[in-house]
Amino acid sequence: MKVMASVKRICRNCKVIKRHGVVRVICTDPRHKQRQG
């Protein structure tokens, strides 16, 4: 899980979602998981 100021999609499998007011990226590749902090 990377905590980034700006979250972006890295590959086409990445999805940007908002969960409890926190922007997250979920992906099939676990290295692409990000959270806005």
Curated annotation (Swiss-Prot):
Pfam family, one: Ribosomal_L36
GO biological process entries: translation
Keywords: Ribonucleoprotein, Ribosomal protein
Keyword Ion transport among record annotations: no
Organism superkingdom: Bacteria
KW Ion transport (keyword) present: no
Single GO term (MF): structural constituent of ribosome
Cellular component terms per the entry's GO annotation: cytoplasm; ribonucleoprotein complex; ribosome
Signal peptide region: none
InterPro entries cross-referenced by the UniProt entry: Ribosomal_bL36 (IPR000473), Ribosomal_bL36_sp (IPR035977)
PANTHER family: 50S RIBOSOMAL PROTEIN L36, CHLOROPLASTIC (PTHR42888), LARGE RIBOSOMAL SUBUNIT PROTEIN BL36C (PTHR42888:SF1)
Similarity field: Belongs to the bacterial ribosomal protein bL36 family.
Xref: NCBIfam families: rpmJ_bact (TIGR01022)
Name of this chain's protein: Large ribosomal subunit protein bL36
Highest classification ranks of the organism: Bacteria, Pseudomonadati, Pseudomonadota, Betaproteobacteria, Burkholderiales
